[in-house]
Amino acid sequence: MVSARFRFYEELNDFLAPQHRGREFSRSCARAATTKHMIEALGVPHTEVELVLVNGESVGFDRILHDGDRVSVYPKFEAFDVAPLLRVRDRPLRES
């Protein structure tokens, strides 16, 4: 098992247990767990996720988590273009 820290932003918090909303929390993960696996295991549908950062770097859903990773998970962006940062899909969820 490895331990990673997670933080979900904006409306993604609606999918989380109340004690995890709006704050960073630690979670144990299977040794080969991917970002997608853990996001969904925490109750957030991956289809609602636009950007995942692990230790400040944009990653795809296939990124295997390591002990001590800090995972930030973001929903659709409305105010600015994040296309150059995306690693979880080919184009933004929301088109301007």
Model regions and ranges:
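Ubiquitin-like/PB1-type beta-grasp interaction modules and other compact soluble beta-rich domains
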Residues: 1-96
